[in-house]
Amino acid sequence: MLNILKKLYNDDKRELKKFEKYANKVEGYADEMSKLTDEQLQAKTPEFRERIKKGESLDDLLPEAFAVAREGAKRVLGLYPFHVQILGGIALHFGNIAEMMTGEGKTLTATMPVYLNALEGKGVHVVTVNEYLSSRDEEEMGQLYKWLGLTVGLNLNSMSPDEKREAYNCDVTYSTNSELGFDYLRDNMVVYKEQMVQRPLNYAIIDEVDSILIDEARTPLIISGEAEQANSDYIRADRFVKNLSEDKSDDDVDDDEDYGDYKIDWPTKTISLTRTGIEKACKHFGLRNLYDVENQKLVHHIDQALRANYIMLKDIDYVVQDGEVLIVDSFTGRVMEGRRYSDGLHQAIEAKEGVKIQEESKTQATITYQNFFRMYKKLSGMTGTAKTEEEEFREIYNMQVITIPTNRPIARKDMPDILYPTLDSKFHAVVEEIKKRHANGQPVLVGTVAIESSERLSHLLDEAGIPHAVLNAKNHAKEAQIIMNAGQRGAVTIATNMAGRGTDIKLGPGVKELGGLAVIGTERHESRRIDNQLRGRSGRQGDPGYTRFYLSLEDDLMKRFGGDRVKDFLDRLSDNDDDKVIESRLITRQVESAQKRVEGNNYDIRKQTLQYDDVMRIQREIIYGERMQVIDADKSLKNVLIPMIHRTIDSQVDMFTQGDRSEWRLDSLRDFISSSLTSEQVTDSIDFKTISVEDLKKKLYDIVEKNFEDKEKALGDPSQMLEFEKVVILRVVDDRWTDHIDAMDQLRQSIGLRGYGQLNPLVEYQDSGYRMFEEMISNIEFDVTRLFMKAEIRQNISR
């Protein structure tokens, strides 16, 4: 392990050394650029583009182009990138992650690689976590790019396809990660090429890259259509599970007895019925066997009702507002507008909370951020905290994390954690600490992990008469404004996790003298990176600052991972005094060890997600590629359709003519021919008693050929025939693909059970997924055969 760390450290140093050489060359152009007139500086853009056309590479242009962007920033924005920002920009250009501390000017850093890469004219996407940041950065930094002769676009959720297309056709496009992903999926659902909005994915710079590629890696982007579903099923399942009790016995108990109706595995957040629970379900619903095939839907509803009632926590995982269940992002603490849990979980939570149950949706297209961003030709990112996830970035995205030095030394004091026996004693201590600092006028930012904690603390501060602002998923409309004011004298701000990320906290007048911004964490997050983000809110650009985490044995992390050892240790020291505070290296080590375990666990889950999603990725790329060829076609698709129909004929005829002629299933064969290929009259004219298999196939091929010619004559216009062919293929492919996505999702959820049979679930998923994909292709060809052969020709066919 030590050797790996040493190697990473050396790689980092080696890369920085290489970047230093480039940075010095950029600095070497500074005088030359400063002497140019505005017109001469602006003329550099067409000059660079001409040089690229003649074969000069972006790497060759880097020093001069960076110097142009740097000088342009000074003239247009009044900001001149420091040497460390040039280093960060170089790291981004070479497809790395630039780890830069809060307040080190990541937005300005990105202008240089954005300018350089935009010169190719293939499009650069600057990706942010929300539309506020996209709009802000496009407005501010867009001035520079426009001044330098580039086009700049902003891609928003509310825009029409025409507006989006215009934004994507610009040299530089600002967008959120979700909008990029959804536009990609929508582009692969269109039926006319002109409806597409995106160009091929070229280069992206992701701001807050850890938030998007790590925290949201497992979040699939889903485009859904409504599916029929009886809401009463959710209510029945909900009523049943509400009367169950948890089995809290240890896993290592040897007896076969159940101690409750369901069991929860908290580290993986999985829940299942025990045998007692299964017996209760059979009795409650009047069944002989809960797991009979016909009870599949009921089992699904019970599973989701269990998750909704005992795993999903109100005000932590979701909130209820105006009779609606809204998901809370566990990393940002924000409500995820318009996002719904899939597969009926959202409806199960609605049943649990007694609000109106909305229709279950059917997935039409889906992709994870992991697989979407891996499609870019070049990818880079910026964040203040990525080093703890370095291995994941390298393994999954092939990106190295380069720690960029700060422009000024860090003056912030990071104090050791302190631990209390109970939540009450911890919150009491936090309020006292805030009171003391507030009395001196020092601004305080308090970080909480859950909405529940922020509201509890807010109530305690109200009782203490301390004015404060609360920033959580319930009121994020003004979050940027609240965060901007958090550094003013006397300000007390409570923030759930990293709400307001991307907005700097600047210190107000006289605050430096008071010790800068004090950051108090009320709980350790399961990821060290999120804790580091909270710390990084204080001490920007060499400012003074103070940070400390207050913990209790009743914190979620302590309860879930290894709290017993700490509790024993505390019992020995504390003499049963609830207000006794413990500062010990053991506590810090135990917390960090728990965090590392959770991080390792989460990484394994994300890696596994990717392995499973790779099966769908390959299938998705095949379907989307074939679809695009159909949409793009400008001449007859006969050479695609005829082989599809021939394969269908071959498989169906072979299936019905196995064995001796006496064993042939002639009735089924006749049905296939008359229902899928031709009329009953033509079918009756075939002498099935004497014809050979090969002659039958040839006869059917001839019928297909004649049908094709008849349709061409009926339409008269080759473009109309092409349109008809496209309609047939696209309708069938889209219907079958949508069904396949659902089937693969159900396979994914059921596959874990096969692990009990000593089988590798991933291998089983890959094998079953491959078979299902082949079956889907076969079904597509069968449906295309029937639709093409039996469809009546009409003018003005609509896709």
Swiss-Prot record:
Its EC number is 7.4.2.8. One of its GO terms (molecular function) is ATP binding. It catalyses: ATP + H2O + cellular proteinSide 1 = ADP + phosphate + cellular proteinSide 2. SUPFAM superfamilies: Helical scaffold and wing domains of SecA (SSF81886), P-loop containing nucleoside triphosphate hydrolases (SSF52540), Pre-protein crosslinking domain of SecA (SSF81767). Disulfide bonds: none annotated. The keyword Ribonucleoprotein does not apply. GO terms for biological process: intracellular protein transmembrane transport; protein import; protein targeting; protein transport by the Sec complex. Gene3D superfamilies: Helical scaffold and wing domains of SecA, P-loop containing nucleotide triphosphate hydrolases, SecA, preprotein cross-linking domain. Its main location: membrane. GO terms for cellular component: cell envelope Sec protein transport complex; cytosol; plasma membrane. It is an enzyme of class 7 (translocase). It is a peripheral membrane protein. InterPro entries: Helicase_ATP-bd (IPR014001), Helicase_C-like (IPR001650), P-loop_NTPase (IPR027417), SecA (IPR000185), SecA_CS (IPR020937), SecA_DEAD (IPR011115), SecA_motor_DEAD (IPR014018), SecA_preprotein_X-link_dom (IPR011130). Belongs to the SecA family. Monomer and homodimer. Part of the essential Sec protein translocation apparatus which comprises SecA, SecYEG and auxiliary proteins SecDF. Other proteins may also be involved. Part of the Sec protein translocase complex. Interacts with the SecYEG preprotein conducting channel. Has a central role in coupling the hydrolysis of ATP to the transfer of proteins into and across the cell membrane, serving as an ATP-driven molecular motor driving the stepwise translocation of polypeptide chains across the membrane. HAMAP family: SecA. PANTHER family: CHLOROPLAST PROTEIN-TRANSPORTING ATPASE (PTHR30612:SF0), SECA INNER MEMBRANE COMPONENT OF SEC PROTEIN SECRETION SYSTEM (PTHR30612). This is Protein translocase subunit SecA. It comes from Lactobacillus helveticus (strain DPC 4571). The lineage of its organism: Bacteria, Bacillati, Bacillota, Bacilli, Lactobacillales.
